[in-house]
Amino acid sequence: MSMTRRYSSTQYSNKMSLQSLSSLLLLVTLFFSPAFALKKSYIVYLGSHAHLPQISSAHLDGVAHSHRTFLASFVGSHENAKEAIFYSYKRHINGFAAILDENEAAEIAKHPDVVSVFPNKGRKLHTTHSWNFMLLAKNGVVHKSSLWNKAGYGEDTIIANLDTGVWPESKSFSDEGYGAVPARWKGRCHKDVPCNRKLIGARYFNKGYLAYTGLPSNASYETCRDHDGHGSHTLSTAAGNFVPGANVFGIGNGTASGGSPKARVAAYKVCWPPVDGAECFDADILAAIEAAIEDGVDVLSASVGGDAGDYMSDGIAIGSFHAVKNGVTVVCSAGNSGPKSGTVSNVAPWVITVGASSMDREFQAFVELKNGQSFKGTSLSKPLPEEKMYSLISAADANVANGNVTDALLCKKGSLDPKKVKGKILVCLRGDNARVDKGMQAAAAGAAGMVLCNDKASGNEIISDAHVLPASQIDYKDGETLFSYLSSTKDPKGYIKAPTATLNTKPAPFMASFSSRGPNTITPGILKPDITAPGVNIIAAFTEATGPTDLDSDNRRTPFNTESGTSMSCPHISGVVGLLKTLHPHWSPAAIRSAIMTTSRTRNNRRKPMVDESFKKANPFSYGSGHVQPNKAAHPGLVYDLTTGDYLDFLCAVGYNNTVVQLFAEDPQYTCRQGANLLDFNYPSITVPNLTGSITVTRKLKNVGPPATYNARFREPLGVRVSVEPKQLTFNKTGEVKIFQMTLRPLPVTPSGYVFGELTWTDSHHYVRSPIVVQLSS
């Protein structure tokens, strides 16, 4: 249909300008008026509930009604409140998640009954020889002294994860040989996951994700199934069955298992396709943690996180406090933002925060040059089609006409010229885009293979990926040599050997470059991470809904895959926690953490101090107390225990007022202890930021072993004088508690910055070691 009447261009322009201007003014007025203020999803946190042990459904309905009534006073009506709220946290966490505008959120935050109001923030996922490396077995044999044997492989402990769901058909979650589900379990399974006596729970939480994205709910958001692979990988690492013949495309063949292979497992799906760089949202995480507490889990593994933040506006910190208060041990990943300092996340003192390090297995894929040079690389990709020398080309020399050379060097999409690449081995630089994406771009350009060279930040950390083409990743120094060869040789040629699994490699462990580092930017007086565990090239169960690279064009499928990240180290500790919970069912979460931390090691398999990705000496900001030793954690001798009251005292010591802490605890009688001092918080590590004069630290040790006398030994941090009183502690019975004090003072001439030492209490059988971290001012 055409218009017969028309304006001259000038008439049309003037008329439209006036109309547009008036419309624009109207839109601006409406947009910035209170009625049209931009709405977002928020969490309104009201603290804890003071429920009786048995809660009726009517009581829970009453809690939800009280949330709506409370919100109605700010949004105009009960109906508006009902429409705005998409989660009511009714059982352990007191609060709700709702769609609010900024003004409403600000007004609610002023109410005296409100602890905090904060945006529904997004979190990132922090993406089996390892158990042999940690000495739970040796050459496939489980010895009598193994924690596996002592703890019955974690039998009937219930371990859950917050992740991308689960692939229930995996053999890692088969219930063959399992007895009845523990009677204490109150959880359930969504209809799309066939649960059994091993996989006893599967639920999804999506309202926070949908509220943030504005997407309508559909079948793809109403499932517990794992379409990413991350959740199945982490859950099976924590508590998957023994599965013989596990491998990735024939490489690394062996028996896969989790840390607590006879534990029961539950999956709480809180992570969805990425949006704005995040997959898992606080509103969903809080709802899942509340459900996990009520369902009866013993251990909660969370391989998710974001930037460290204030405890009262951090969904993971809030939820995990309520879990720990109810006896659930919470284990969190430290993050993958290393090696930069001050990047560690999940720093709340009631969670176990886990860094990532290597182990003594590599999937070696050597790169050989025509001139006889050879570089040790790693890969899980298929071999080259022919055993011959191939032409090599630097990706920087393969850029498209008028293209960005840096993009080409990084092998980014659209940066490579197929005419230059076809049939050759392409040499790319690590950084920016995903390692597997570089392989995909190389393959798309027609490369026969790819060598991926580490950038300086990645150092010696090389990661095995199941690339879509023959490939190998080499370290930074070898990469420099290779690029030099390419630039100085007229006809450079090389070959990538087929990958093979190699054991007993040295040095191991060393810290992964990606593992986030301290110091703790929220509370510098608490050392984080707490511990490190294997997190590089970990083979575990995977989904069959996507390929091992998670790229849309990767049509391959594998029941097991290798992944790296603190996401992988976190469930290693969760599995160890499951064993300790089985062996010592009455230990508190703090006692379990103490046992893991104080029995760890800081030396590698060369009996030298652990190193970082550049093979320089590492320190507690990267590994915390050290690398986990499960068998020693079974009988630590002494523990640094903590109660809910201690955590409340901690909050007072770091500056939260009495009213906020009362709401947090749901205890109107609680009063911040006068003189509460962070230096006396009974943490298993000792950290003193900004030491300028003499200070005294107080700690309490609880005997969990037989009667014994312990003597103090210490290694002083450089420039610090240390004394301990008393120097000897005698325990006459199990459960007895003794107090000691450590005094630290700077020497007249001291270095500036952080310095490190350690304190060990020993009865010649047990060695209870704590790192000492001190910041000195020049």
Swiss-Prot record:
Location of the active site: 163, 230, 567
PA domain sequence ranges: 401-486
SUPFAM superfamilies: PA domain, Protease propeptides/inhibitors, Subtilisin-like
Disruption phenotype: No visible phenotype under normal growth conditions.
Keyword Metal-binding: no
PROSITE patterns: SUBTILASE, SUBTILASE_SER
Catalytic activity, EC: 3.4.21.-
GO molecular function: serine-type endopeptidase activity
Tissue: Expressed in the vasculature of roots and leaves, stomata, sepals, stigma, anthers and siliques.
A GO CC term attached to the entry: endoplasmic reticulum
Gene3D superfamilies assigned: 2.60.40.2310, 3.50.30.30, Peptidase S8 propeptide/proteinase inhibitor I9 (3.30.70.80), Peptidase S8/S53 domain (3.40.50.200)
Domain Peptidase S8: 130-634
Something else known: Plants over-expressing SBT5.4 show a clavata-like phenotype with fasciated inflorescence stems and compounded terminal buds. This phenotype is abolished by mutating Ser-567 to Ala which completely disrupts the catalytic center of the protease.
Name assigned to this protein: Subtilisin-like protease SBT5.4
Organism name: Arabidopsis thaliana (Mouse-ear cress)
Lineage: Eukaryota, Viridiplantae, Streptophyta, Embryophyta, Tracheophyta
